[in-house]
């Protein structure tokens, strides 16, 4: 996805840009690695701002790849240093985006491979199912686990998510740090367009 660049940051429901291309959005808990993953996929460490502070992404960020596909970095859910009112605001914009965006082809739900699904992730999965939103699950920070532990976590998450009518297979894993799994995920994204 070389040539992908930041084009817009949206903080309210009336400002969504219309690129006329398919969109793939990335969601997950705060600090799961959404921005780092976008940087790895686009091979540009400066595309998406990253931070060790949870809740740093407080708007929906759009990255356009040569007019072919848009990658969308959604604010993290869960812990944030933002005020409750600000958090409610950007989560409302995110919900509106997910429910109304016709260009959205796939949501990629990121789960920290060291932690697995937390209750808030399971709640989000239920919400996606209730609203008929197609999604994939990708485990992040795979470089932090041994091959055996990673395989066990993939199986665990697969079992936890089983029965999802809108879950698209397979569950994948990536490491933004080492680059493992990035090419495979980019290929999977290209299949959405």
Swiss-Prot record:
The keyword Nucleotide-binding applies. GTP binds at residues 28-35, 55-59, 73-76, 140-143, 171-176. PANTHER family: ENGB-TYPE G DOMAIN-CONTAINING PROTEIN, MSS1/TRME-RELATED GTP-BINDING PROTEIN. Its cofactor is Mg(2+). NCBIfam families: GTPase_YsxC. It comes from Anaplasma phagocytophilum (strain HZ). Mg(2+) binds at residues 35, 57. GO terms for molecular function: GTP binding; metal ion binding. InterPro entries: G_ENGB_dom (IPR030393), GTP-bd (IPR006073), GTP-bd_ribosome_bio_YsxC (IPR019987), P-loop_NTPase (IPR027417). Residues 20-193 form the EngB-type G domain. It comes from the Bacteria. PROSITE patterns: G_ENGB. Transmembrane segments: none annotated. It holds the Pfam family MMR_HSR1. GO terms for biological process: division septum assembly. Keywords: Cell cycle, Cell division, GTP-binding, Magnesium, Metal-binding, Nucleotide-binding, Septation. This is Probable GTP-binding protein EngB. Belongs to the TRAFAC class TrmE-Era-EngA-EngB-Septin-like GTPase superfamily. EngB GTPase family. Necessary for normal cell division and for the maintenance of normal septation. The keyword Nucleotidyltransferase does not apply.
């Amino acid at each position: 996805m070389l040539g992908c660049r930041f084009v817009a940051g949206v903080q309210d429901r009336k400002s969504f840009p219309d690129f006329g291309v398919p969109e793939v959005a990335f969601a997950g808990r705060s600090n799961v690695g959404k921005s780092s993953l976008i940087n790895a996929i686009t091979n540009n460490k400066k595309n998406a701002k990253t931070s060790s502070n949870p809740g740093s992404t407080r708007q929906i960020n759009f990255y356009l790849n040569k007019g072919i596909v848009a990658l969308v970095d959604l604010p993290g859910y869960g812990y944030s240093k933002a005020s409750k009112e600000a958090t409610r605001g950007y989560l409302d914009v995110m919900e509106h985006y997910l429910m109304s965006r016709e260009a959205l082809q796939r949501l990629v739900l990121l789960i920290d491979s060291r932690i697995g699904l937390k209750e808030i992730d399971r709640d989000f999965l239920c919400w996606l199912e209730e609203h008929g939103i197609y999604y994939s699950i990708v485990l992040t920070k795979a470089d932090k686990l041994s091959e055996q532990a990673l395989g066990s976590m993939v199986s665990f998450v697969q079992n936890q998510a089983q029965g999802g009518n809108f879950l698209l297979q397979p569950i994948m894993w990536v490491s933004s740090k080492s680059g493992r799994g990035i090419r495979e995920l980019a290929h999977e994204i290209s299949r959405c367009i």
